[in-house]
Amino acid sequence: MSNNQTLFERAQRIIPGGVNSPVRAFRSVGGTPRFVARAQGAYFWDADGKRYIDYIGSWGPMIVGHVHPDVLAAVQRVLADGFSFGAPTEAEIEIAEEICKLVPSIEQVRMVSSGTEATMSALRLARGFTGRSRIVKFEGCYHGHADSLLVKAGSGLLTFGNPTSAGVPADVAKHTTVLEYNNVAALEEAFAAFGGEIAAVIVEPVAGNMNLVRGTPEFLNALRALTAKHGAVLIFDEVMCGFRVALGGAQQHYGITPDLTCLGKVIGGGMPAAAFGGRGDIMSHLAPLGGVYQAGTLSGNPVAVAAGLATLRLIQAPGFHDALADKTRRLADGLAAEARAAGVPFSADAIGGMFGLYFTEQVPASFADVTKSDIERFNRFFHLMLDTGVYFAPSAYEAGFVSSAHDDATLDATLDAARRAFAALRA
């Protein structure tokens, strides 16, 4: 029995499912999860000592690679002065100033510890600001595991939303309306029907939890126009795509200014950190200034802030995002070319440092499109690549991530492995 198997069996005795986040359990693809022993640059080593090229990067935060020397040094510098204070620090101001500089739509920002906290708090703030209850989200977009966001569409546009998780009360879910991503007509119909009830629309401008699906400019511009017209708050959830699609996030890429933005992953540099921010007149409704309550013991944790600040400074290097996008595009195009040469139905997309792999002929534009992917073939591909030391997301519904540490050698090795994997899929 491998060390990975031994650890997984041990974990399952004391941790539900053996993992602390469901996708890590390999339930979608089968097999034994890899338990990470250490990581460096574009690689990690599992409990059996095998090395993998890592295209998850902790699900997005490791944009400069694992254990970057500048990030490590920043963390080491602050450790001797204390791990957590529950009181303000100058470093909190510095990271807030950095975020506001890089994302101009954010006039004020509040630090939290997770993406779920960021989206949950932003929605509460939007409700407090507008005095309304209804929120609109989109099928396939994931915004964390708060009750009001674990909701699926009802049987028709105007029906109440239905919970997607046990433990979510129907009375909570009914305040959430779920629409199809990139469907402008459905959006217009919803605002015509109950626009005056909508507190906020929350959207991933580049979705990463139904694999990679880009918002179309038409769709995102319609969101901006309709929310402004009806007095609703437009929230961009850039926890995943923030600082990855462009230095200023997806909102810079598309040229669209939201009212509030949720950030995470990259801003913690691999440490637990997230944030939400936006217009000053909205943010002023937060306690202690206003009546919308939000708090957190570890918010603005000095160790997390140090890692985040170091990462944000590294990604401002001239040409950083152009180089990252070029690498990611080379990977996506190379995989598509290898599949095409093998005669395997497949498509791929990339934007910034994010990419998507789909076992379908066309790049998806909605969750319904993603579900047409050949899941069985994806699972086989995943294991073929894993066996050769390439670690993609263990789910057909997750995006992948490239870092600045991925060099030509790692990309070449990945494409060589893919050539053999696609040939095996065809056989």
UniProtKB/Swiss-Prot annotation:
Listed cofactors: pyridoxal 5'-phosphate
GO biological process: protoporphyrinogen IX biosynthetic process
Superkingdom classification of source: Bacteria
Broad class of the protein's primary localization: cytoplasm
Family annotation (Gene3D superfamilies): Aspartate Aminotransferase, domain 1, Type I PLP-dependent aspartate aminotransferase-like (Major domain)
Cross-referenced InterPro entries: 4pyrrol_synth_GluAld_NH2Trfase (IPR004639), Aminotrans_3 (IPR005814), Aminotrans_3_PPA_site (IPR049704), PyrdxlP-dep_Trfase (IPR015424), PyrdxlP-dep_Trfase_major (IPR015421), PyrdxlP-dep_Trfase_small (IPR015422)
Keywords: Cytoplasm, Isomerase, Porphyrin biosynthesis, Pyridoxal phosphate
Signal peptide region: none
CDD domains referenced in this protein's UniProt entry, alphabetically: OAT_like
Associated pathway: Porphyrin-containing compound metabolism; protoporphyrin-IX biosynthesis; 5-aminolevulinate from L-glutamyl-tRNA(Glu): step 2/2
Enzyme Commission number(s) of this protein: 5.4.3.8
PROSITE patterns linked: AA_TRANSFER_CLASS_3
Positions where N6-(pyridoxal phosphate)lysine occurs in the chain: K265
GO molecular function per UniProt: glutamate-1-semialdehyde 2,1-aminomutase activity; pyridoxal phosphate binding; transaminase activity
The reaction(s) this protein catalyses: (S)-4-amino-5-oxopentanoate = 5-aminolevulinate
Record-level GO cellular component terms: cytoplasm
Assembly, per entry: Homodimer.
Sequence similarity: Belongs to the class-III pyridoxal-phosphate-dependent aminotransferase family. HemL subfamily.
Protein known as: Glutamate-1-semialdehyde 2,1-aminomutase
Gene name per UniProt: hemL
